Amino acid sequence: MFAARFDPTKVTENVLTAEVTQIKEPTVPQKRKRDAETDDEGSGEDDASSSEDDASSSEDDSDTISEQDENKVASVAPTETSQQSVDAKHSSVLNRFQQTLSLQGALSASDKVSSDNDVHDEDVSMKDVHSLTPIPQPAKVTNEALKLLDPSTYKSTAWDAATKIHYDSKMVKQFDSYEGELDARLLKNITSNFSSETFPIQTILFDKVLPLLNSSFKANRKLFTRRVGDILVNASTGSGKTLAYSVPLVQILRSRTVNKVRAIILVPTKILIHQVYDCLSKLSQGTSLNVSMSKLENSLKEEHNKFLYNSPDILIITPGRLVDHLQMESFDLKTLKFLVLDEADRLLNQSFQNWNQVLFHHLTNDKQDKRPGNVIKMVFSATLTTNAEKLYNLYLHNPKIFLTDSVKLYSIPKKLQELNVNIPTAKSLFKPLLLLRIIHDIKSSASRNAKILVFVKSNEASIRLESLLHAMLGSGIIEDEYNMFLSSIHSNISKGSSRKLIQEFASSEQKKSVLISTDIMARGIDINEITHVINYDLPISSQQYVHRCGRTARANTEGIAINLLVGKGEQKFWSQHIDTDLSRDIDGYQPSAYLDEEKLSELFSIEDTLKDTYKGCIKQLQTSKEADSK
């Protein structure tokens, strides 16, 4: 009753038995076999389309395939009759298939899409793809005149808006020549406590500022600050900056009648407070000026009551402490005439309690005259020229900047001798031993003992180096050198201990005194007796180098700075990043080698027995450190 369904598996079995092994023919349903038997053109077109990928087939192969098709159709003849009803249902699908085949035959060769054309299209599309390279930039517009200058000179262009006044190291005068500008008692205090000759920065300041300051103060005591303007001073360390700003303060304020805060001197550290206080105390002898200092060792409440009862004329203070007193209203700023920033670069880098904003907020609220220039701001630093952008918050009025007559950033004292020790990388292990040998070679003169300040990079390095030097001296690795003052100072010890160590170092009567320090000693410590500075670890910038070396060759005395440079890397860093920023006097010293080649080879020559002793000292320190940790 019903026709048998078409079974493709039977057709596949019959096809596989008759298939030639050379050509593999896919299984085709019966309806397609019937069409292939009755329609030779359709079969030819179908064969042509099925063999499209094999263009090298011959006509003989085509005949063989057609004969095989006929054999396959004959083998499935009984099944064909049973599938006629099924074929009728799929006639529409078969018609569409035949139409597709006929359309493919009618296509022209140019319309057919081949794999070669696809590759060609891909090649064309890739022509506009660029590699990941930077976008071309327009050429820079440069000033041809600047090409003739050294690149380091460009750093000095930040002060174009200020009135620049240059000075050189030869500007030295007798203090007696300022007899008409300075009070007689003040002049006597200067010559008896300090010097009879001025330093260059003092000379230029007294020549340019004192006459204007005196005349403006006589004309109008309330508004003289606006006529004078603000003063910015770029001077090397140890050039007499403290005396340079202290003398004008005492000269103007000596005749005041009522105690009011008229001058505030901001310093970055408590150690500097004592130095400035000593200077002003000596200058103000014989006057009624009240010079006070505020420091953390004192109770804030006691200082508050003290300032309320007896207001100072000149106050020396750190930024954080100043904010505390302003918030407690220990004093007001109505009568403030001078604001001095000593070591300004470090002050401007500090943000303790936002001291800058708090100070100028109170200054604006307390002052009746709120126009610019109501306070003379005196900014002093050895590295001032790098901080032009930070001075914006000081609200400068008609500023005058005093610069050394040099295109370099920083100036080195004329009598400072710089010596470089180029240590090979292979000898870096014995760097502490080489340091001890260099200290041993330093000779003390008959006039003064050798006081050596050694700078290291960290607190741990300071402690470790001191212990190792003590161990080497105790082992007799260097003869006749055990009897010397040797200590270290760092931020891990208390302020009282630090001050005591500094006093012991300064007053030591031994022929050699060595103090190992971090950069805490690099600023503002006024010890004129330091003969040598050794940079055991190279500073990170030319600015830090200037402050370190400024501990010696102070007050026009001789000084020596020895730099230990390990390997070519540190030697290159010193020459390219430190030395290029430094200006030296033509008549002064220039950097040179510590020793000639023959003596330098003797310095680096270390015997095996000495190596064993040195390594034994290191092992001893390691053992003691492990024992302390337990």
Swiss-Prot record:
Q: Could you tell me what this protein does? A: ATP-binding RNA helicase involved in the biogenesis of 60S ribosomal subunits and is required for the normal formation of 25S and 5.8S rRNAs.
What is the designated name of this protein? ATP-dependent RNA helicase DBP6
Sorted alphabetically, which PROSITE patterns does this protein's record hold?
A: DEAD_ATP_HELICASE, HELICASE_ATP_BIND_1, HELICASE_CTER
> Where are its TM segments located?
none
Question: Motif Q motif: which residue numbers?
Answer: 198-206
Its cellular-component GO annotations read: nucleolus
Helicase C-terminal domain ranges (all copies): 434-601
Entry-linked InterPro entries:
DEAD/DEAH_box_helicase_dom, Helicase_ATP-bd, Helicase_C-like, P-loop_NTPase, RNA-helicase_DEAD-box_CS
Q: Where is the composition biased (Acidic residues)?
A: 37-68
Which organism is this protein's natural source?
Kluyveromyces lactis (strain ATCC 8585 / CBS 2359 / DSM 70799 / NBRC 1267 / NRRL Y-1140 / WM37) (Yeast)
What GO molecular function terms would the record report?
ATP binding; ATP hydrolysis activity; RNA binding; RNA helicase activity
State one Pfam family annotation. Helicase_C
Q: Which CDD domains match?
A: DEADc_DDX51, SF2_C_DEAD
- Localization per record: Nucleus, Nucleolus
